[in-house]
Amino acid sequence: MHQSSLSLDFFGSPHERVQKALASLRAGGGVLVVDDEDRENEGDLIFPAQTITVPQMAMLIRHCSGIVCLCLTDEYTRRLDLPMMTERNTNTQQTAFTISIEAATGVTTGVSAADRVATIQAAVAENASPENLRRPGHVFPLRAKPGGVLERRGHTEATVDLMRLAGHAPCGVLCELTLDDGSMARLPQVAAFAVAHAIPLCSVEDLVAWRHGLGEENIAISA
């Protein structure tokens, strides 16, 4: 099969796709998640925040948009005293950015892969507090809706849901996959990237179906 013609079906059934994604996350690997063509129509590369490595961060920076985001629950953002980036969110998709962050210690300019990993580690440490972070910085936290993908079908919520289901703390790192010319990767290109790098691929809708199958309609996500 030519890679340009790859579709989600190439990666198995919806259930199998989520299974493979969770297995990768449990092993400290990454996943690719696409949303609906009528929404952002983008694919995000996602890693667990607790275990992300410098090579994984370098991969995000090299192949993605450069806007590295840390997806968090509301409890995390309150614990870290992270206010929303704006009081009135007029973003079309209601993407919930907080003010950006940097680790208070152990970083230089905050831009390198190592510095961004240090910032994420500072934010998600078990004893993390507002004093561990500087504001603004080069990592962009996103606040997930409490109901996850059952409340909002976004990459932020998909990331937090996947981490929880994989047994990680509900926090993950994402960045949007881009092409060499700087344009956004769509499903065929995301699928080809997944095959080339042996990364599982699933969709937000796959995760919605998985959660419905678990009878989780009323289960909120918490830290």
From Swiss-Prot:
The subunit field of the Swiss-Prot or TrEMBL record says: Homodimer.
Family classification:
Belongs to the DHBP synthase family.
Asked if the Swiss-Prot or TrEMBL record annotates the protein with the keyword Coiled coil, the reply is no
Q: What is this enzyme's EC?
A: 4.1.99.12
Described purpose of this protein according to its UniProt entry: Catalyzes the conversion of D-ribulose 5-phosphate to formate and 3,4-dihydroxy-2-butanone 4-phosphate.
Q: Enumerate the PANTHER family for this protein.
A: 3,4-DIHYDROXY-2-BUTANONE 4-PHOSPHATE SYNTHASE, GTP CYCLOHYDROLASE II-RELATED
Please indicate if the UniProt record lists Membrane as a keyword.
no
Cofactor note text: Binds 2 divalent metal cations per subunit. Magnesium or manganese.
Residues involved in D-ribulose 5-phosphate binding: 39-40, 44, 152-156, 176
**Could you tell me what this protein is called?**
3,4-dihydroxy-2-butanone 4-phosphate synthase
Q: Which Pfam families match?
A: DHBP_synthase
Question: Single Gene Ontology BP term?
Answer: riboflavin biosynthetic process
A Gene Ontology cellular-component term: cytosol
Q: Which SUPFAM superfamilies match?
A: YrdC/RibB (SSF55821)
Q: Where does Mg(2+) 2 bind?
A: 40, 155
**Organism of provenance:** Desulfovibrio desulfuricans (strain ATCC 27774 / DSM 6949 / MB)
Q: Which branch of life, at top level?
A: Bacteria
Which HAMAP family does the protein's record reference?
RibB
What GO molecular-function term can you cite, just one?
Answer: manganese ion binding
